[in-house]
């Protein structure tokens, strides 16, 4: 049996570059302010570090997309939840003791946006860990788009 060793040339990034890249990804825990960190790191490092710049820009785009997705999902959930009040309003005498079953479906469906938010955030934190390790991390959602549009890093 012949063993083939895979040769890779991995660029060693400085600790500062890795820290800035990881911070850009980890900023996802700050919520709506997350893209600001990525944009600030991108703007301050674009002349200094291609690695930190690329990771920060990618993180900012991912976080902005996440904000848009969350706005849409929470708006849809809010609309659905508001619709569950129609039976209560129309038949207030019937539902004095307990809300209709559709109300509980609306409450239970709140888990969907929470799961999406949690997974989105965990993926961002995974990106932070990979960036801290010095890996050339690419988000599955926006990684290729960012690298194609901004090929200078």
Put a short name on every predicted segment.
Residues 2-31, 35-64, 129-153:
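Membrane-interface extramembranous regions at the lipid-water interface
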Residues 2-12, 88-101:
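Long, highly hydrophobic alpha-helical transmembrane signal-anchor segments
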Residues 20-38, 59-91, 102-127:
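Hydrophobic alpha-helical transmembrane segments in multi-pass membrane proteins
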Residues 80-94, 141-151:
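Charge-rich, acidic-biased intrinsically disordered regions
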């Amino acid at each position: 049996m012949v063993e083939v060793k895979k040769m890779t040339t991995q660029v060693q990034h400085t600790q500062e570059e890795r820290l800035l890249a990881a911070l850009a990804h980890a900023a996802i825990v700050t919520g709506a302010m997350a893209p600001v960190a990525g944009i600030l790191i991108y703007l301050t490092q674009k002349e200094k570090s291609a690695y930190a710049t690329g990771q920060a820009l990618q993180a900012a785009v991912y976080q902005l997309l996440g904000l848009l997705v969350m706005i849409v999902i929470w708006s849809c959930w809010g609309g659905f939840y508001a619709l569950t009040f129609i039976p209560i309003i129309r038949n207030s005498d019937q539902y004095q003791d307990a809300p209709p079953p559709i109300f509980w479906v609306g409450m239970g469906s709140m888990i969907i946006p929470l799961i999406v938010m949690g997974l989105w955030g965990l993926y961002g934190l995974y990106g932070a860990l990979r960036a801290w390790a010095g890996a050339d991390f690419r988000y599955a959602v926006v990684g290729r788009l960012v690298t194609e549009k901004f090929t200078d890093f």
